[in-house]
Amino acid sequence: MWRLRRAAVACEVCQSLVKHSSGIKGSLPLQKLHLVSRSIYHSHHPTLKLQRPQLRTSFQQFSSLTNLPLRKLKFSPIKYGYQPRRNFWPARLATRLLKLRYLILGSAVGGGYTAKKTFDQWKDMIPDLSEYKWIVPDIVWEIDEYIDFEKIRKALPSSEDLVKLAPDFDKIVESLSLLKDFFTSGSPEETAFRATDRGSESDKHFRKVSDKEKIDQLQEELLHTQLKYQRILERLEKENKELRKLVLQKDDKGIHHRKLKKSLIDMYSEVLDVLSDYDASYNTQDHLPRVVVVGDQSAGKTSVLEMIAQARIFPRGSGEMMTRSPVKVTLSEGPHHVALFKDSSREFDLTKEEDLAALRHEIELRMRKNVKEGCTVSPETISLNVKGPGLQRMVLVDLPGVINTVTSGMAPDTKETIFSISKAYMQNPNAIILCIQDGSVDAERSIVTDLVSQMDPHGRRTIFVLTKVDLAEKNVASPSRIQQIIEGKLFPMKALGYFAVVTGKGNSSESIEAIREYEEEFFQNSKLLKTSMLKAHQVTTRNLSLAVSDCFWKMVRESVEQQADSFKATRFNLETEWKNNYPRLRELDRNELFEKAKNEILDEVISLSQVTPKHWEEILQQSLWERVSTHVIENIYLPAAQTMNSGTFNTTVDIKLKQWTDKQLPNKAVEVAWETLQEEFSRFMTEPKGKEHDDIFDKLKEAVKEESIKRHKWNDFAEDSLRVIQHNALEDRSISDKQQWDAAIYFMEEALQARLKDTENAIENMVGPDWKKRWLYWKNRTQEQCVHNETKNELEKMLKCNEEHPAYLASDEITTVRKNLESRGVEVDPSLIKDTWHQVYRRHFLKTALNHCNLCRRGFYYYQRHFVDSELECNDVVLFWRIQRMLAITANTLRQQLTNTEVRRLEKNVKEVLEDFAEDGEKKIKLLTGKRVQLAEDLKKVREIQEKLDAFIEALHQEK
């Protein structure tokens, strides 16, 4: 039935559409036109004219996916105008788009539902963590109550402030463009840019002036840093030298090391180095020849020496003092032009400007290092070897320039120090004095000539050198004045020879070759030579070098054997003195004695590890109890014992033990352990070893012990671990057997007996001697002691009446005692009564506690069975057992820390201290003293000098 009805309704709809619609004749398919907007073509229409039917329809839209409704449709009369077939494509496109939005909407709704369902499934899979909410601290949930986030937000800079702090990129781009224009040739902005730059030149000038001080300060700091690392480098080089010596001395089987043959001048230089150390140590002066270069400041001493060495090796400055300590330069012939220091293996290639600059810088650093705080110059010598082709073999010493006035920045004694250094070198009767005089200044301003004439009045070992002759020829009006100087007629001094040299034009960057060429050219064209005022052999540094070398070797051959004989006699005297004073001892110098002492000290430190654990624990436990016994008795036991019942006693004890463990006990235990380690270490270090003990090491051992103890620090985590262990030990109240019970009673009796003895002594000092001592030793009581005695007797009567009297006197009791004493004619102060009562009651309490302790000997059975007996409560025994057990456990823990960690750390500190002392020569001289040490040092030095002199003399004879 319903199908018939549906068909009837469909027919009615069709008939209505046919009746009221007019279509377009053609082949347009009806299913592609919209229900409302399309015109329907009908084959039975009488005309082909388009009409606008009055069609009524509902607002419901239908698509191809929906069925037509079964109810009757009501069409509204809509009139359609004529539209061509080609203009219907927008309607078709709109229809399709309207269909598409339903697809998208449906997909979105379905996808959202699916996503929500998936999210719910995942949420169900996550476990419920609400029951673990207690793990998070409450402060996290209440953080907004403690922290004002709004206040923090206001304190932070705003976005506008941050924008202000950002760089101005427009200015940066503008600056870069200006810079680009500056480097671009021919740019129109170049002129303007440079004009702006000229305008800022004045500001830059002031900035440079202000920055100059900073640069000087930075250079000074850099110099100090270089000196610091120079010391480290010297120490490493010294260690390397010693190791190399050990390797060379090692005699492997079947291996023969080749012995290098040294040159004659090198052997002589080594002799002078050893003699220099010997002279500085014993304040003496050897008589071996050397060329001493002296002169006024800025007279050209260093330049002459550089011309002889054929290299600019010294630091120089315009008018300021640069030579601050003597520099010994050993010149020898070799294939390569190199320089090296005595205590360093680095070679400086003098043909390279980089190495020359490094050498000058190194010499300046060594000079500054030699100069002590508050001084300007130093007498310590810097030893430098220079080798090269064509160099004359000799040894020269460049001394600081002689000055007439001490300027600001110099030490007050600078002038006297320079004179003393110069005299010390020139007073050697075999020293060749190379006197340098500036020819460009007036002869009357010379200082050094007077000094030289004093040291060598006959001129038998002086060579006079006139520098800057080119300037003198230009400035001096009378050339004959130069002739008078060279002939020795102007200065009040005599010399072996007179020379005139030119050492440059005053430019420090000139090379040696350029200076030599200039010197030769000058003398070839000089009027002084042309007019025979100067002789040819008296000019140029080449002739000077040859003359000085010949004179030097002549003096060496004449004096070296005499010096060797004198050192042989000195050696014989020292050896005889040693045999007479120390016949059974080896000749050990200071370094060898230090090595011997070092081995002994390390052996004694190792002995600490051989101490038995039992000994460690005994001394630790005893020392710890001595440290804490007063606190245990006075602050824990006595206050708790004043309580009326055992519950209050235990509560008081637990509280006080907890406070003590948390604050004081671990620190006290570590202090005791550290002091015990020091005592044992000192005992091993100072314990005499019998007849083999050498007291010469006592000062060194004491210094090593003190320094090692000062450097040693206990492990920082020891207190934390001890606190836990001690707290657990004091918490244990269970005594397991009768032996522990008896040990606790014995420990308690010892502690109380010691306190009782101290109390008896205090009362005796308070009341004076008793009748026995008064009769036997003729001692009497003072008036104050008599008052204390009467007060004590009165208080003892009160205690006998009430043996369970509390620890403190009431005010009425004090009044009663005072009135009783006044009735007997004794005036007493209430404070005196309280002081006397404290000692009397303390003695009474300790005696009562000892009696109670004796009763508790048989109380272990009651304690073990937990019997409640008010007459026999032994809580104080349990307290002392807890203290005793804590002491034993603490001693065991500290012993483990000592043997496992601290002893090894102390041994490491001792090794470090010994290494530091080994590098400090002054420390060894201070700690290893005595006639025996000094005699061995002298003997070693003299033997070394004599052996080197003999080797040099032998080589000198072979060369002849």
Curated annotation (Swiss-Prot):
Name of the protein in its database record: Dynamin-like GTPase OPA1, mitochondrial
Query: EC number(s) in its UniProt entry?
Result: 3.6.5.5
Intramembrane spans: 771-781
Segments carrying the region annotation (G1 motif) are 295-302
Region G5 motif, annotated ranges: 501-504
The annotated region (Stalk region) lies at 589-836, 874-928
What happens on changing T630A?
Answer: In interface mutant 1b; strongly decreased ability to mediate mitochondrial fusion
- Name the residues that bind GTP: S298, G300, K301, T302, S303, G317, K468, D470, T503, G506, N507
What changing C551Y does, per the record, is: In OPA1 and DOA+
Tell me which residues bind Mg(2+).
T302, T323, D398
Q: What is the effect of changing S545R?
A: In DOA+ and OPA1; decreased GTPase activity; loss of function in promoting mitochondrial fusion
Say which family it is in.
Answer: Belongs to the TRAFAC class dynamin-like GTPase superfamily. Dynamin/Fzo/YdjA family.
CDD domains according to UniProt: DLP_1 (cd08771)
* GO cellular component entries: axon cytoplasm; cytoplasm; cytosol; dendrite; membrane; microtubule; mitochondrial crista; mitochondrial inner membrane
List each copy of the Dynamin-type G domain by range.
Answer: 285-561
Spans annotated as G3 motif: 398-401
Its top-level enzyme class, in one word, is hydrolase
